[in-house]
């Protein structure tokens, strides 16, 4: 139920019908309810800055024209007081209803209406920063009720489906998306300042290469063929490095036809960069510089408290230290130490090694879905043994070749690759490696991936002969790096769910 100026309670549907009737009546009588334009002379921020210069009651001589949305209204004696918002700022607009023509307009206006006003800035007797309106008009009437900021939106489904309503009344939500833009801007500036070129690559591909993930399939009517929505821009970006663009990056959407949970959404935003003449050691240093510098820039400190809210229920807080250097964990060394194994890169591809790993999974109570490939079994053990240790930013490095089909062999550790993942709060944020640039080795890796794919591993990569051909022209020694922006935003904005940092997350139809 909602209450209006007449103090009569109306249901949402009754309010809608009444409001539609009022607007239609005004339009029928020739009133312009949806004007094309309203010329603004001052933003709310500029008006408030001018008012701040005087701390006593006053009405200025300057005339301002501005506009915003009515978020609350009250009638007191002959005056109607509107709290109007614009771009996150709030301003009181005072209308003297006894002045000619204003009483009828004041009666028509409702909470949620977008209005334009002209008047003099000043302060009321209670010293409230205000504009004393000489004219106020409707720019867009609001036909439906908007929840009050006090009660807010409780239902997550409504929040995600009607983000516009969430943004109207939830200051925390607006701030979170502003910080998201700040984070993306910081990454872009960081790379631009180091000579990287921002590029765009196709989102529809013949082969879904670049990551171990299940793709979405679409169909191109004109070409009469199925295409895959990209799971990563990696292979295209490396082709650009082959073409002589030695430092490139792309910020954009990826699509993975997988599960939805607190930290996964099928459509997500990533940044990937590729840097000729760099290796994964250089990228670890750059990652520390980027992430630690970003946190320092946003919060003025390298230590923050991640305190997520699940709606009104606050979950346990976690202190995260981004102080350099970050902790480093070598995968096989840690698995051996924690599980009492004797794994080595040279023997990882043996059948008895897989049996040892499956036995370790059984002892730890872990179930591995078929097909039980070496990559899947190792991934399960890493998730169980290593990832829970990675609360503060931690590099997990030197992945086995079976887990890293596009990464270069480790220069001193047989069977391993020069790859790392950065974990924060036990979740992967970054993935990077010294790029495999040997076309002979790359073909062999793709062949193994094809075998895994045929065995039922729907996350294995397809063979990309065009990419191998590009490698034959010569990919310089290159470091490649990717970051999941949505997860990073979660941890820097106290979001409990990845859907809280995506304007319009993937949802089932109502």
From Swiss-Prot:
GO terms for biological process: lysyl-tRNA aminoacylation. It catalyses: tRNA(Lys) + L-lysine + ATP = L-lysyl-tRNA(Lys) + AMP + diphosphate. It is found in: Cytoplasm. It holds the Pfam family tRNA_anti-codon. InterPro entries: Aa-tRNA-synt_II, aa-tRNA-synth_II, aa-tRNA-synth_II/BPL/LPL, Lys-tRNA-ligase_II, Lys-tRNA-ligase_II_bac/euk, Lys-tRNA-ligase_II_N, Lys-tRNA-synth_II_C, NA-bd_OB-fold. Keywords: Aminoacyl-tRNA synthetase, ATP-binding, Cytoplasm, Ligase, Nucleotide-binding, Protein biosynthesis. The keyword Aminoacyl-tRNA synthetase applies. It is an enzyme of class 6 (ligase). It comes from the Eukaryota. PROSITE patterns: AA_TRNA_LIGASE_II. This is Probable lysine--tRNA ligase, cytoplasmic.
